Amino acid sequence: NNSNSVFDSTQVTFPKLLQKAGYQTAVIGKWHLISDPVGFDFWQVLPGQGVYYNPPMKNAQGMVKTQGYVTDIITDLSLDWISKRDKTKPFVLMCQHKAPHREWEPNIKDLGFDKDRVYPEPPTLFDDFANRAKAVGENDMTLEKTITPKDVKLVRPPQLDAEQAAVWDAYYEPRNAAYQKANLSGKDLVRWRYQRYMHDYLATVKAVDDNVGRLLKYLEAEGLAENTIVIYSADQGFYLGEHGW
């Protein structure tokens, strides 16, 4: 939680129970609980929130360097674990993606995938939350007040290698120069932030879609789909229209 308390790994958790029942267990990707995972035969997780590009990870042996995009890496590790598991035992895998957590940094290969499409603005883009539940207006998650230069890619992520940085700069630098020249303010600035957010967010989600697809196709190809329960859940996203609460 936001107080950064350490998860109590001595308590009963469902991976522990399944492990005791004979399941192979693994967690790969986002963890964000400070304490090391317990109840897993294999784990490799991101320290804290992790980063999108070339993320360091941690497993039972210590820190691990990786190269590439975090959503691809988590999926690659997940597929590798499934393929090497003991096929005589049932298994549970928690494939936990960082994306699309803030700052919504897309896979380099997906930059511009939507060809600068102009996205329709929701009628609630300038909502003042006056007719909403009190908690909605108190949350710090608006395009007007909350967005930072890093959120809208006016700052390049420091984790990029030279090749990744070149692609990043080729995409963002001319668009950022046009933004700086326009010197936007007020509602025009909110509108620009909305378009930038949508392009980045959807490009980031595209990688999740692609990689969930890879995982499902693997289950089908290996004859595991009919006997495997897949649970998909997510908890990320700014207000982009519907927020009645």
State where each predicted segment sits:
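Formylglycine-dependent sulfatase
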Residues: N1-W245
